[in-house]
Amino acid sequence: MAYLNNSFDEEAQSFGAFCARALLENACAALVGRLDSFRMLYLAEFQAQGAYEYGKPTKSGFKWTGDVFSEDKPLATLWNSDHDSSKVSRALFSPHVDAVLWQPAFNEALDYLADECLSGFEEISTMEAVSFISAAKGRCGPLYSKLSKGVHWDFFVASVMMDEGTLKDAIRDCLTVVSNLAFISHFIPTCYRSLDRAQAATEYLAFRETFQ
């Protein structure tokens, strides 16, 4: 947050993208864990084994493509008795998770905001349930790639390093999409550790005030 709200300096230019991508990844991982607790419990148990190796890639480890974004191409039809259930993605942004969890929750959130006449939710209120997750995917994908260039340090020429506007816009986009997802998640009845709706709204507004 300091890299966004404070004056731009060399430290922000060097580490801002790294911190923002870490936030994006960890926030999405937390949402995966709250929606699919077995996935997190499996990872925790797997990593607790004595054979776990830090320097070796793990096929079952948490992955951006697989846990957040679906690995496979979308199915032509979501609901078909011929689908192999083992191949139905449970990724955070998968079409099935969107249809079963995110879209009903988004409609619940809109109804709550309308009933309570709450302000400060204009961005969410202008969206539609059917496009909420597709919009989040559309922001998270390019954002992840942009921030990754700062993490892996693709900038070998000073002229292409992120300037203040580019970096701060990326950080702001990251905080915005994460806060929107987090707020809607509290309207998913099966989501672990959901806040009371009033508290979720209060926390959302307080968080948004820190960077708007």
Q: Where do the protein language model's features map onto the residues?
A:
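Amphipathic, Lys/Arg-enriched alpha-helical patches that create a basic surface
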Residues: 117, 134-145, 164-211
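Histidine-centered, metal-coordinating catalytic motifs and their short helical/loop contexts
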Residues: 122-126, 130-159
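Short, hydrophobic, well-ordered secondary-structure elements
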Residues: 1-39, 147, 175-179
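Non-cleavable N-terminal signal-anchor transmembrane helices
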Residues: 59, 211-212
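Conserved catalytic-core motifs characterized by acidic clusters
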Residues: 2, 45, 157
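Short non-catalytic regulatory patches outside canonical folded cores
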Residues: 21, 28-137
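Charged/polar positions within long, soluble alpha-helices
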Residues: 28-36, 145-159, 179-190
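Residue-level recognition of alpha-helical structural elements
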Residues: 9-12, 16, 136, 160-163, ...
